[in-house]
Amino acid sequence: MTYSYTQISQYLSCPRRYRHRYLDGWQEKDTRPAMLFGRAFERAVAALFRREDPAAVLCEQGSQSKDAGLTYSGSDTWDRMLQQGVQLLERFAQDGRVRIRRPRTSQQVQFTRVLGSGNSFVSYVDAIGELDGTPCVLEWKTSSARYPEEPAGISALDPQLVCYSWMTGIDEVAQIVFVRKRLVEVQYFRATISEQQRQEFASLVDDTVRRIDSGWFLPHNGIRFPQNPCTTCPFVGLCLDKSDLVETALVRKPGVDLGLFDELSF
């Protein structure tokens, strides 16, 4: 069996949700424009480092999603998101703070580990390069709001960055956040992951996989305000046995969707 960070995160969020998605085959409908934009934008960033036309790649990828029945929030439209994306690419290129020396082999890099249980764990790292001259693992993120900058080094607590450090053995990690707002902004965060953090994450993975293999899928009930994750969970219709909610939010894929390549952009 092969696991990924996404699967571990889903299980820790709610074991029942994990079962609905990865064992029963239910999957959330792709109606969230921010998610589809993020995928298209990552492809455009990769094209930028390959010295291709990133704006053309973004628009080409975006044209496939424009008429997909997406649900927008506020004043967002697909054309507006694409315009912001082009502006972010231009700002990022002007900053010139990130370098990838081998862009054809150092982007979307696959790493695999064999766990103590005999299962495998796979990760796809956005890129391995340099931020301000420091070699590091690079992660691209798109957001409609700025990430907090204080306290300094807060990104070292991001579990996905810890995961990337554990998988690659690289201490230095960096998160590049492309912020879509009226005046676009690119944020740069770098952190150092300790050996203790990597070992703790490895233990967390082993423990979680052990529970999954044991068929332990109890629900994490969340209707206790103000902590109410169940109200925004796309799988809530399954837990409430309400077919209308299921039909609105989910589709069922034939067979089991193991989600092994959730983090693979292309």
Model features per residue range: what roles?
Residues 1-7:
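Short acidic, Pro/Gly- and aromatic-enriched capping/linker segments at domain boundaries
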Residues 8-53, 82, 107, 232-235:
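Nuclease catalytic cores
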Residues 11-19, 52-69, 169-181:
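Short, compositionally biased low-complexity segments
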Residues 15-28, 64-69, 137, 145-146, ...:
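Short amphipathic alpha-helical segments and their helix-coil junctions
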Residues 33, 37, 81, 157-160, ...:
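Hydrophobic (often cysteine-bearing) scaffold residues that line and stabilize catalytic clefts
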Residues 40-110, 114:
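A non-catalytic, helix-rich entry segment at domain boundaries
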Residues 103-210:
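Mg2+/Mn2+-dependent nuclease catalytic core
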Residues 154, 165-266:
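Metal-dependent nuclease catalytic regions and adjoining charged, substrate-binding loops involved
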